[in-house]
Amino acid sequence: MKIAVTYDNGKIFQHFGKSQYMKIYETDENGEIQKVHIESMGKHSHHGIAGYIKEMGVETVICGGLGQGAVDSLEKAGITIYAGNSGNADMAVIKYLKGELIKNSDANCDHHHE
């Protein structure tokens, strides 16, 4: 399984669509982390990120806030969303793998895109 975390300097970046990096965790069938790397989102932003990480095989996203457009794109791509998180990215993934990370359905950000 692959898990993507919006990432900035060791922490969960708080705006999915503006995240410049995703930290990608690859686990084995026992839920043990096997590989970790940081992927630049480069030219991808907002709705484009969902398709890009889907192509990488990501199944779950851990992030801070995200807009409804990103939610729709991720859900359409079949990616599970764990929003409303903050703090250390590695610790969030460990909590997720232990079944301790809680989904927050109220973590959508309401803003206008230019």
Where are these predicted regions, by residue range?
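Short secondary-structure boundary segments
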Residues: 7, 64-65, 85-86
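Histidine-centered active-site/metal-ligand motif
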Residues: 15, 44-46, 111-113
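Short acidic active-site motifs
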Residues: 11, 48-49, 91-92
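C-terminal structural segments of small proteins and small subunits
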Residues: 68-112
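N-terminal first-folded block
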Residues: 2-41
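Compact, glycine-rich, soluble single-domain proteins
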Residues: 34-56
